[in-house]
């Protein structure tokens, strides 16, 4: 059989999606990849498929886009897991979805690890309000916190994480290190010193030993901001150790055998270059990579007809039609002694199997004589048929060129990373916006074609 573009060489390692999500030891699946490759849809489709196969699933999206909620029929996602209605729960599974609310997660940590008075002082602190709303790195750290909270909750046995686009998708891996550097930095130690020393000694230390430093900081930051930061650091002092401990624990959780990273990419050069970066970064961080999901792969139901043959046939039809136009200009309109050569060309293409006027498919067909109505093709529609056939052949040639380019790009990645299991997802004809579409993606995720398969992937 001739393989089309959605097939993989049989010797390539295969990513068995159903085996991955059915395994009770798989507790966390992290989908990462560049933007615009269908990562959010993939995460949602995995969640739906796992739930309908009996897992209790929660899908956590860190991406601020609302596509996940829309596809699952939820009006809006927030920091609380919402159950997705319409999922087949006959196998005992269920599906929840949520979107990380960075500030709310930070507030919950403060409220859960400080007494009421200290929590109120922290939450009302202007510096804290700015930090929790958008300080660089806060989102990634809060993602680590939320993931740790979900994993500690026995309500779900599978967590699917949809990460932000581009290389920032793996920034949460650096959150514990960045947090440790922040807490151990000179700036924080300076601000924490008065609180640690306490009383008059603390004031003396601040007034004598740090007067030059605080004067400089006041000029740079403003006196009120410096006081806000000092108040915040003093109130958070007892909580800093807990932040680091939990972040380190979640980092180790991501390295554990129960976690699986899926790199999602499209069959395009830039997307697969990013995928290669993710693969190498995960290996460096000793994170368990399950494989690559190659999304939105195009196929053809007539892969036997090469781009070259299709273009040659289209050019022949176009040239013949031009000749007929010139001939018609000097021929009496009533003279119908011979069929125009355009009609003969169309019939010839049908005879050798390049064009099927009846079925509308291009490709290899059983050779045979022209249809009994061939002689009737003297009508003006013969030119229209030739023009249509030429256009379809050109479209087919363009599709086959896209397929060839996608295959070359894919093969370049697999040659560089032969150890990475791959599954290819055939492109759907339209966008996914409901559970039915997510189920269709889930089916294609699990299909995993090889070069021994022969299938039409176009809907």
Which role fits each region the language model picked out?
Residues 47-124, 169:
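N-terminal phosphate/diphosphate-binding loop that engages ATP/GTP or pyrophosphate donors
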Residues 1-37, 44-58, 62-83, 245-248, ...:
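Extreme N-terminal, non-catalytic leader segments
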Residues 117-264, 268, 274-277:
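Phosphate/Mg2+-binding loops and adjacent switch elements
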Residues 22-23, 50-52, 88-91, 150-154, ...:
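Conserved catalytic network of the ASCE P-loop NTPase/AAA+ motor domain
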Residues 28, 59, 97, 422-424:
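Conserved beta-strand scaffold positions in the cores of enzyme catalytic domains, especially
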Residues 1-22, 218-234, 244-262, 268-459:
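C-terminal lobe/tail of nucleotide-utilizing enzymes
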Residues 66-71, 105-109, 167-171, 272-273, ...:
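Switch/connector loops and helix/strand junctions flanking conserved nucleotide-binding motifs
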Residues 57-61, 160, 292:
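Short beta-strand "acidic-cap" motif of Rossmann-like dinucleotide-binding folds
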